[in-house]
């Protein structure tokens, strides 16, 4: 005997994560990894390419406008790091080399 369905299961709205984490280092902790710090200071374009490659994307991706912001947001999403795209934009706008160093340290620590 079959019974009619009286209530449909409800979907979940949005993304909720109870296991969110923080960045392993702050934006201005550049001296934690001196090699990354020097690279970010003197050749940030090379560091951006390395971060993109370590993230799993093409190393030429940073040549596209806005792609470093997308990679930073992707790192946050992949590792469930708290924050927002607005926060990512502010960090990259006001101290891009330090932010690139933070991204490189995060990928190094997580991989």
Curated annotation (Swiss-Prot):
Belongs to the cornifelin family. It holds the Pfam family PLAC8. Disulfide bonds: none annotated. It comes from the Eukaryota. NCBIfam families: A_thal_Cys_rich. InterPro entries: PLAC_motif_containing (IPR006461). The lineage of its organism: Eukaryota, Metazoa, Chordata, Craniata, Vertebrata. This is Cornifelin homolog B.
């Amino acid at each position: 005997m079959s019974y009619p369905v009286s209530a449909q299961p409800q979907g979940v709205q949005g993304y909720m994560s109870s296991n969110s984490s923080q960045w392993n280092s702050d934006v201005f902790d550049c001296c934690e990894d001196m090699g990354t710090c020097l690279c970010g200071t003197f050749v940030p374009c090379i560091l951006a390419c390395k971060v993109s490659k370590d993230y799993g994307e093409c190393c030429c991706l940073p040549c596209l406008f806005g792609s470093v912001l997308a990679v930073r947001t992707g790192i946050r999403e992949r590792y469930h790091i708290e924050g927002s795209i607005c926060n990512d934009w502010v960090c990259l706008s006001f101290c891009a080399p330090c932010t690139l160093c933070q991204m490189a340290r995060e990928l190094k620590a997580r991989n």
